[in-house]
């Protein structure tokens, strides 16, 4: 009996000797995972984030049909019946995300560089120089709607980063797209400038046309037709918006919407009260 007890004691002590370091190692790993969190410097690509947003938007639209009908959902259905031609917000959000994803793929594939090399002097773009002004004025109107969409998307994406990394031709194209070939200046071209510059200038918005007429030569003879093109006068109406001024059809729609809103609110409050009663009874029974 004594020998057997000694063997059992040695066996238990041997197991404890082997298990002790294992427990320490596991505890050390847990402490390291608990207090040490490595910093991930790599940022997920924009295309992956857009795909995730599209997937979440689609999942949200499918799961929303399984949830109970809420007040906002009821009102949206009412307005969709009253305005069948109104766009669906979920579909607009999903289509917008898909459009951003497509533009991101086009930008990552280098399509913007292909467009710039095609329309704006390839030699200057490769040497990181400015685009020739005549080429810019002649070829910029030739850009299609898809090209302009890609340019706008590239401007919005690249303006978030370091502007020192942008090429000069891209900055020039960005500047021209935003402000025109004259830029955001207080003085534009003289009234006695060449006809080609004047004709190109008159295609700009009317507020710059106003500067063109008045800034550089205040004594210039302005025709009444020019004043009508520059100045837009709006007269305020003395009539106020009141309930009596609404037409009967609009009154009927507003009254119907208010009635349905009150009905849905009363129904939701009644359901909430019925849910609270069993909970109160259960608490009383438990006490």
From Swiss-Prot:
The chain crosses the membrane at residues 250-266. One of its GO terms (cellular component) is mitochondrial membrane. It is found in: Mitochondrion membrane. Residues 1-24 form a transit peptide. Keywords: Membrane, Mitochondrion, Transit peptide, Transmembrane, Transmembrane helix. It is a single-pass membrane protein. Involved in respiratory growth and required for cell survival in the absence of prohibitins or GEM1. Belongs to the GEP7 family. This is Genetic interactor of prohibitin 7, mitochondrial.
């Amino acid at each position: 009996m004594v020998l057997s007890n000694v063997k059992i004691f040695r066996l238990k002590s041997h197991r404890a000797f082997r298990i002790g370091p294992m427990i320490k190692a596991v505890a050390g790993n847990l402490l390291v995972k608990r207090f040490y969190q490595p910093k991930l410097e790599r940022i997920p690509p924009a295309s992956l984030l857009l795909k995730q947003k599209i997937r979440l938007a689609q999942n949200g639209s499918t799961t929303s049909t399984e949830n109970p009908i809420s007040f906002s959902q009821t009102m949206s259905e009412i307005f969709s019946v009253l305005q069948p031609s109104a766009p669906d917000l979920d579909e607009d959000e999903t289509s917008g995300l898909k459009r951003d994803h497509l533009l991101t793929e086009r930008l990552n594939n280098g399509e913007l560089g292909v467009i710039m090399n095609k329309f704006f002097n390839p030699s200057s773009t490769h040497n990181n120089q400015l685009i020739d002004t005549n080429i810019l004025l002649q070829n910029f109107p030739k850009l299609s709607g898809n090209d302009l969409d890609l340019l706008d998307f590239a401007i919005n994406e690249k303006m978030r980063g370091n502007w020192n990394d942008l090429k000069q031709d891209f900055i020039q194209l960005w500047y021209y797209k935003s402000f025109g070939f004259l830029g955001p200046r207080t003085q534009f071209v003289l009234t006695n400038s060449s006809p080609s510059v004047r004709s190109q200038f008159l295609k700009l918005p009317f507020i710059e046309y106003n500067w063109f007429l008045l800034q550089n030569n205040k004594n210039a003879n302005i025709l009444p037709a020019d004043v009508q093109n520059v100045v837009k006068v709006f007269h305020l109406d003395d009539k106020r918006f009141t309930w009596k001024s609404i037409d009967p059809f609009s009154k009927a729609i507003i009254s119907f919407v208010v009635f349905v809103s009150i009905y849905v609110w009363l129904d939701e409050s009644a359901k909430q009260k019925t849910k609270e009663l069993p909970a109160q009874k259960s608490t009383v029974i438990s006490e």
